[in-house]
Amino acid sequence: MSTNFQNIIGTQLGQGTITTGYTSFYKVPPDTRTYIKEFDICNTTAGAINVYVSFVPVAGTAGTSNAILYNASIPAYSTLQWCGAQIINASGTVQAKASAAGCTITITGGEAQ
């Protein structure tokens, strides 16, 4: 039986400030698959903020059909941590938006070619 193993090196894939419109925080390079291990969203404001995160396939649009978080409320001065095991294929993206300014996202995982 032939087995094709690939080295996957863990790394920070993306980080940034979430706005009120969907923004791409990570795009999978060509000829690559990406393993999303976790993402953290930190609310740095005095009020709750609702967030939306989608793992969007190539030529797709962020929304309910590919949501990982949808209208999830993050309390004031709190951090939401999502842990899982999701694979995104070449040219797919991780996109997020929020109901108001004041959140940052950090995405970690690994890439395999």
At which residue positions do the language-model features occur?
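C-terminal interaction-tip segments
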Residues: 1-34, 38, 97-113
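Solvent-exposed, conformationally flexible loop/turn segments
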Residues: 17-23, 73-80
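Short structured motifs
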Residues: 22-24, 38, 67-68, 80-82
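Short solvent-exposed strand-capping/beta-turn motif centered on an Asx-Ser/Thr pair
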Residues: 41-46, 99
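Short, surface-exposed beta-strand/strand-loop-strand elements in extracellular ectodomains
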Residues: 46-70
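Beta-sandwich interaction modules
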Residues: 75-91
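Short, surface-exposed ligand- or partner-binding patches at beta-edge/loop junctions that are enriched
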Residues: 91-97
